[in-house]
Amino acid sequence: MFKVLIITLLVNKIHLEKIYNVPVNCGELHPVKAHEIKCPQRLNELSLQAHHNLAKDEHYNKICRPQLKDDAHLEGFICRKQRWITKCSETWYFSTSIEYQILEVIPEYSGCTDAVKKLDQGALIPPYYPPAGCFWNTEMNQEIEFYVLIQHKPFLNPYDNLIYDSRFLTPCTINDSKTKGCPLKDITGTWIPDVRVEEISEHCNNKHWECITVKSFRSELNDKERLWEAPDIGLVHVNKGCLSTFCGKNGIIFEDGEWWSIENQTESDFQNFKIEKCKGKKPGFRMHTDRTEFEELDIKAELEHERCLNTISKILNKENINTLDMSYLAPTRPGRDYAYLFEQTSWQEKLCLSLPDSGRVSKDCNIDWRTSTRGGMVKKNHYGIGSYKRAWCEYRPFVDKNEDGYIDIQELNGHNMSGNHAILETAPAGGSSGNRLNVTLNGMIFVEPTKLYLHTKSLYEGIEDYQKLIKFEVMEYDNVEENLIRYEEDEKFKPVNLNPHEKSQINRTDIVREIQKGGKKVLSAVVGWFTSTAKAVRWTIWAVGAIVTTYAIYKLYKMVKSNSSHSKHREADLEGLQSTTKENMRVEKNDKNYQDLELGLYEEIRSIKGGSKQTGDDRFFDH
């Protein structure tokens, strides 16, 4: 997958040089009439109809480029082979156990392609567990094999024609993808192309590339430079670009980054020009420019033509024209065309006027009105173009090297400048005296014997040296695949991590792989736990459990507190019982002592009486 840089501005230092279209190497001047003066042919300067009479080796080329809207990805699938197993075990005492298992195996390429072909007959059968076969005192396994296709579009690099994807073990060739598929880092999957469509990305399908015709010619400013021009690309220096292949086709990356193929490549375009192969340069695709050169130049040509027609209208109406009006008759494009020289004539108009305060006194028209109180003759000098001449000249662009706004004769690079010129005078106006100008062809003014001033500049101004401010969609591929070698200049970019579990959408095979990590024996009902309905049930169970747990803790606390109170009462009762027992024991002891004393008394009495009547005493004590 390529990295899209949605906002990338290419800003080059703009250095505009003034370029003037000067008539040189002119032929002889010939007088013409006013109605024979005509405007130069002004076409859209970037159109193919605008000709270069002085261009060398001029011809047309057909160049093409991919459509920006096209995709550089290939249609295909990630193919997986799965065994869905149902295991049923039944014991002799009729206890049944059912287990489900999904086993991932390495798929065969032929089986994957067959599965793709079956898509034309409808969607593939969704995998399912086979019905359980349970028998008494037996363990039965039922399994079904399925090929699972997951639509996935890897990136086809148009420079090396290799297929890149973060899931691939290594970049894959187109031939390998057709014969054995592209192996993934996960060996249980293989990427295969969609055999139902052409094995090429839309980006590289040149059947619907954008093609234009360009004019190829040598630059008038530098014979060692070749230029291409067309309304779509403007004026391009071919030798400032570099050669690069794209989708297996030869082409040129222009200085501004655009890549174009050369459909009818000619040796004249590349001989004697230093066009080298690109080294590490990636092409971009122009999406927007901040100026519409073609439309602007079209409007400019129309306006210049209107100004030229206005100048001719003034000439035909015998109106005064100035050097700016004269400059509109000159072409702004290099080539061969007419250059005009205007010669001035003057005449004096005499009027007889009377002063307002002279009354009925007759005026004298033979005397000057300023020396008479009655009025007199007024003289008015008029200046105008009296004759017109033209010559067939070569119009060549010349750069104002010292950038002083003037063209020096030395800047003409040895080309002959016409020595014909005329002195034009301007009438006094606003209290100022008139001026005398040394004017040559097309209203050019000699401010010094070797220095010219031109009112208008060539349309080449700013076109050859103007660098467009362009927004690109640039394709970079060095950091897409993690296993690729990163060059030193690419370290500033953060590698793109496109691991399946981070970037891709979750599908049912993802949970299958996660299940296999934790254990192979999984009940099918577990999957339902992750559904939205089961989540609500799960949270309800948790809430009820929390309430029951809280209530149980509260009851336990009350029971412990109650038991503590009963134990205190029991201890008090025991203490009372012990004190009563001690008192009873004390009383019993006293009674015993009393009985002992009484017995001792009787013993003593018996001993006293024993001497006289022993038999009677014995009978007493028996009772």
Curated annotation (Swiss-Prot):
Compartment list: Virion membrane
Membrane topology, record value: Single-pass type I membrane protein
A matching Pfam family: Rhabdo_glycop_CD
Entry keyword Hydrolase: no
GO biological process: symbiont entry into host cell; virion attachment to host cell
Main localization category: virion
Keyword Transmembrane helix tagged: yes
Top-rank taxon: Viruses
Signal sequence residues: 1-12
Entry-listed glycosylation sites: 175, 264, 416, 438, 507
Keywords of the record: Glycoprotein, Host-virus interaction, Membrane, Signal, Transmembrane, Transmembrane helix, Viral attachment to host cell, Viral envelope protein, Virion, Virus entry into host cell
Transmembrane feature ranges: 540-554
GO CC term, one of those recorded: virion membrane
Virion surface topological intervals: 13-539
Intravirion side: 555-623
Subunit relationships: Homotrimer.
Function statement: Attaches the virus to host cellular receptors, inducing endocytosis of the virion. The acidic pH of the endosome induces conformational changes in the glycoprotein trimer which trigger fusion between the virus and the cell membrane.
Family of this protein: Belongs to the rhabdoviruses glycoprotein family.
Protein name: Glycoprotein
Originating organism: Bovine ephemeral fever virus (strain BB7721)
